[in-house]
UniProtKB/Swiss-Prot annotation:
GO-annotated molecular function: ATP binding; UDP-N-acetylmuramate-L-alanine ligase activity
Protein name (database record): UDP-N-acetylmuramate--L-alanine ligase
Gene of this entry: murC
Organism of derivation: Desulfovibrio desulfuricans (strain ATCC 27774 / DSM 6949 / MB)
Primary residence: cytoplasm
Family matches, as NCBIfam families: murC
């Protein structure tokens, strides 16, 4: 950005993607203001770095700014966007600002319907281990930084590429990772064909000397490869992948061999459970080795990984009950998390507390949601977290509970509010249980609420 840009206003600044960009911009000494609907811990953290943030959206929040950056959740009739248009202030999506930051570095973009945040975090851990001090922008709290962004002094920028509204096509990285391609965000794309088209364009956006590192085990990815005109490296468990993992041990630690073509590179001990996390680690190894990082540094970076918030995160234990929190909100993500829970907590009763996220997603995947909880011992269901969407007639937490009862033998209880669920927990949980909270909304409050003995979330 040139010297004309001094003051940047960010609408929806507390969101997972926006807050990381805001933190990097603050560290680059830009003047940052913004607004959000809630006074969250993220908002308070940004204020501590110097941002001026209003709670609630209003025209008067837009001061003497040169550009307004908007979150994907912000509608065109937002009063701050209306005010900016009146004053001919440039309005750009968050991905365009991320692209501007990436223009100053060698970009590595991590895309895919599931697994982006963890894969981005694992990649950052390896680059840190190699002494490359990357700039990192992710959609979750990376424990080693205590934040979801880090301004490094090295030449690389590692970023989570959000496909939800197609704006990830603004990015021009030298390396792309695609973890999977699934049917999601139909509120924007409308059809699976449109999703596929966006990912093909994303992969073809790398330069001729760049590389796409893609999961060769994912049918959605494989379907697109004939249309990709740029170099590709596949990874996965299947033997026809160029970069391959052979699992050796599962549990709270995943130990596996790594092969590149016919050469055994060595072994990795990853302090994260689940086959999906082995795949995420393989992708990060592929990205790291492409820029010249040795396998030994890759293995060390993965072994020392400190985790990322809300990704199978152990929150604590009380009265013999273990509490785990996970961001999973799509049926495929939930299935992977539940399989991991069964693997890690073999023989224990799994009590899943799920808060559906968005009316459109619940409607689009209603049948899958009804079946995905078949292997939990008890399901506690709350009302849908709207995430700024308007309700859809006939789509609710209660209708989902009814649908699950029709096709599954899993006991399910519905709670209108999170507080109702919090008050019921002491009568539901038993010694030896695992309470697994699932969803992208405020369900994350439930575990700490119970651990602290509170009756409201």
């Amino acid at each position: 950005m040139n010297s004309k840009i001094r003051h940047i206003h960010m609408v929806g600044i507390g969101g997972a993607g926006m807050s990381g960009i805001a933190e990097v911009l603050l560290n680059l000494k830009y003047e940052i203001s913004g607004s959000d609907m809630s006074d969250s811990a993220v908002v308070r953290h940004l204020r501590s770095l110097g941002a001026r943030i209003a709670v609630g959206h209003a025209a008067e929040n837009v001061g003497d700014v040169q550009v307004l950056v908007k979150s994907t959740a912000i509608s065109d009739d937002n009063p701050e966007l209306v005010e900016a248009r009146k004053r001919n202030i440039a309005i750009i999506p968050r991905a365009e600002m991320l692209a501007e930051l990436m223009r100053l570095r060698q970009g590595i973009a991590i895309a895919g319907t599931h697994g982006k945040t963890t894969t981005t975090s694992l990649t950052a851990s390896i680059f840190d281990e190699a002494g490359l001090d990357p700039t990192v922008i992710i959609g979750g709290r990376l424990n080693v930084y205590g934040a979801n962004a880090h301004l490094g002094h090295g030449e690389y920028l590692i970023a989570e590429a959000d496909e939800s509204d197609g704006s990830f096509l603004c990015l021009l990285p030298i390396i792309n990772v695609v973890t999977n391609v699934d049917e999601d965000h139909l509120d924007h794309y409308k059809t699976r064909e449109a999703i596929n088209s966006a990912f093909v364009q994303f992969m073809n956006n790398v330069p001729f000397y760049g590389l796409n590192i893609v999961c060769g085990d994912d049918p959605g990815v494989l379907e697109l490869l004939p249309q990709v005109k740029r170099p590709v490296l596949t990874y996965g468990f299947a033997e026809d992948n160029a970069l391959r993992a052979v699992p050796l041990e599962s549990g709270r630690i995943s130990r596996f061999q790594v092969w590149l073509h016919d050469e055994k590179l060595g072994e990795v001990s990853l302090p994260q459970p689940g086959r999906h996390n082995i795949l995420n680690a393989l992708a990060s190894i592929g990205a790291a080795m492409e820029v010249g990082i040795s396998f030994e540094k890759c293995a060390a970076g993965l072994c020392g990984f400190k985790g990322v918030g809300r990704r199978f995160e152990f929150k604590g234990e009380k009265q013999g009950v273990t509490v785990v929190d996970d961001y999973g909100h799509h049926p495929a993500e939930i299935a992977a998390t539940l399989a991991t829970a069964r693997q890690v907590f073999e023989g224990r009763r799994i009590v899943a507390a799920f808060q559906p996220h968005r009316f459109s997603r619940t409607e689009a995947h209603f049948g899958e949601f009804c079946k995905v909880f078949n292997n939990v011992d008890q399901l506690l269901l709350t009302e849908i977290y709207a995430a700024s969407e308007n309700p859809i007639p006939g789509v609710s937490g209660q209708s989902l509970a009814q649908g699950i009862r029709q096709v599954s033998s899993t006991p399910v209880e519905y709670f209108q509010t999170l507080d109702d669920l919090a008050r019921a927990l002491p009568d539901i949980l038993q010694e030896g249980d695992v309470l697994l909270t699932l969803g992208a909304g405020n369900i994350t409050r439930l575990g700490p609420t119970w651990l602290e003995g509170l009756d409201h979330a």
